[in-house]
Amino acid sequence: MRLPDETKRLAIVGATGSGKTQAALWHLSMRDIDRRPWIVYNFKDDRSIDSIPQKRDIEIDELPLKPGVYVTHPQPNQTDEVEAQMWAIWEKQGIGVYVDEGYMVGPNNPAFRAMLTQGRSREIPIIVLSQRPVWMDRFVFSESEFFQVFRLNHKRDRKSVEEFVPADLSQRLPDYHSYYYDVGENKVTILKPVPSIQQIHRRFDQRLSAIRKTI
């Protein structure tokens, strides 16, 4: 099974409590956080994100340049500020982006779409999460090379994802299991639960502690 590389886009969807955030953090802990900055948009103030060891909090108008994990907490009324920061990321290039929750970016954010459509050439890897994919910008799905799909409670959400993922999402998997779709290989794999959040946080701590010693 392939994992996304430094230029790929990954969409992770699932209902609240399905395991998507833990899976997304596992993916992030495996990415190149020791070689580039990753900006995490924590719209929902998720505690598992805010508890990442060695992460740094930044304001919505900051643009980190050194490797590591940087968390920002946009308010619902800061869509213009989010767009401005995303344009700065697009212009700078070489910065990873993690968005939780995807639909809170806004349905018509041109900077977000630019990163999705041009992220590969500009080396902007992206991880986007959503509990309601039917509300999310369709460019997230059309441009993603990898999908991870957990339990979705709403039929409209399942149908929305099935337009891009060749799996019968009405067939419920065991708790915390997911469908993993590699678009390039046109291959669907059923994944077991990812490691515990404690194990994931330890991996962050190990990797980020090492780069803090060199910065």
List each model region and its residues.
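Aromatic- and Lys/Arg-enriched surface recognition patch
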Residues: 166-174
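Short, well-ordered alpha-helix to beta-strand connector turns
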Residues: 7-8, 35, 66-68, 93, ...
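Glycine-centered loop/turn motifs
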Residues: 68, 94, 174-179
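Conserved P-loop NTPase motor cores
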Residues: 10-29, 75-167
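Conserved P-loop NTPase mechanochemical-coupling segment
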Residues: 60-76
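Walker A/P-loop NTP-binding active-site region of P-loop NTPases
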Residues: 18-58
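Short loop/helix-cap segments at secondary-structure boundaries that form the rim of catalytic
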Residues: 46-53, 63-66, 137-142
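Conserved P-loop NTPase motor module
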Residues: 4-14, 23, 32-33, 175-215
